[in-house]
Swiss-Prot record:
PTM sites of type Phosphoserine: S9, S37, S40
Pfam families: TP1
Protein name: Spermatid nuclear transition protein 1
Tissues with expression: Testis.
Lineage: Eukaryota, Metazoa, Chordata, Craniata, Vertebrata
Organism from which the protein derives: Sus scrofa (Pig)
Domain of life: Eukaryota
The entry's keywords: Chromosome, Developmental protein, Differentiation, DNA-binding, Nucleosome core, Nucleus, Phosphoprotein, Spermatogenesis
Presence of keyword Phosphoprotein: yes
Length: 55
């Protein structure tokens, strides 16, 4: 019983999460990086790192 339950939940989770996530990642991140220059990306990373270190 536990195994079948696990499989069901796993399948449901995968179906619900995987498709939208992939779409968002493909449409948003890739396009953003392409449009924005490497410099701006680096600056964003640095800012994030500093913010994290402060916290």
């Amino acid at each position: 019983m536990s195994t079948s339950r696990k499989l069901k939940s796993h399948g449901m989770r995968r179906g619900k999460n995987r498709a939208p996530h992939k779409g968002v990642k493909r449409g948003g991140s890739k396009r953003k990086y392409r449009k924005g220059s490497l410099k701006s990306r680096k600056r964003c990373d640095d800012a994030n790192r500093n913010y994290r270190s402060h916290l």
